[in-house]
Each structure stands twice: as C-alpha cells, then as structure tokens.
Amino acid sequence: EFRRVLFRSAGIVEVDGKPVMMDNGQQLEYFPLELKLNLTGSSYVKTAGARMAKYEVDRTSHSDGRQPDNDIVLFRYADALLMKSEAKVRNGEDGSLELNEVRGRVGMPYREATLENILKERLLELVWEGWRRQDMVRFGVYHKSYDQRVQLADEKNGYTTVFPIPQKSIDLNPKLKQNVGYK
C-alpha cells in the first residue's frame, strides 16, 4: 500500500493527520537545514533528511513493530509490464498496451510507448525501488551530464557503468577480457 507522508519542518504527520512517531515515542520532526555528511553524535541523527515510506509496515505483528510479518516487495507486476513494453519497443513492436496498463492503474492518460516514455514511467512507477541506475545505464543516459555536474573522464569509456569480471571467470575462460578500467 502506498502511503503519503507530508514533510514540513514541524511535526511530521501522515495524510490522515496521524503523527509519525519515532522509536523514543516523540513525534518525528524534519530538520531539512541540519543535514550533514556525518551525523554521528549529533542530535539530528534520526531527524535530518527526507524519508520515503512507500509500503505500509505491519505494526500489529509485534509490539514494537520492528519485525513485521508482511513480505517485502522484490518484483512487481508493473515492473514486468514495463520490461515487456521496453522489449517490444526495442524489437520494433508497439509496447503501448503494457505501458498504458501501468499508467491506467493510477488514472494517467494514454501515452505512446517510446523508450523515452518508458524510462520516464519507470522513474515514476519504481521510485525508491533500486532500479534507476541500471535503467539509466541500459537506456544509455547514465553519462549524460546534468546541471552543475562535471562529467568524469572515466565515464567516457564506460568504466563507471560496468562492473569488473571476476578473476575466476577469466581464469576459466581465456577468451574473456577484463572490462576497461579494471585490472
């Protein structure tokens, strides 16, 4: 279940007005200007920075709510539909049916299935699920610079988008060559 939480600098509340409580029983307060790289020992260790609560935690399974019985989401049907839409588009087919099934679930209007539209939809639908970097690499936009960001020299040869091939694999198959940037 998607849960929206209102962020402001006073006490944090859920959409229904219920206060969000910290583990010490106090209402959570958001201190956006107190964000630091090292919060160790700071009173803001638990209150700095924004939070995302995408899935409801089963707080009734244990008295402290720390060991919920509900399962974590690993793969979602919407992700499978977006993958199918992408595969169709990459094969020269129309992937609009799958893309718009995802969009229709939340009342969004029809959109043509293009790689650009699919990437945008993956950003919106799969936010905070850990797929964005790999999506950007796969769609070839990971290296595109954005405002205020300097492009690193190593990015031009792909060093920052691929992982090293394990040495054991190279030893087993002499035809494998290590990816550029790794020794």
Model features per residue range: what roles?
Residues 86-87, 127:
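A generic secondary-structure boundary signal that marks alpha-helix termini
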Residues 22, 35, 78, 167-169, ...:
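A generic alpha-helix propensity feature with a strong bias for hydrophobic helices
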Residues 89-91:
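Structural motif corresponding to the intra-repeat A-B loop/turn of tetratricopeptide repeats
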Residues 77, 84-86:
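Structural register within alpha-helical repeat arrays
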Residues 3-76:
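Flexible, polar/acidic helix-loop-strand segments at domain edges
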Residues 64-67, 71-74, 103, 108-183:
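Long, intrinsically disordered, low-complexity segments
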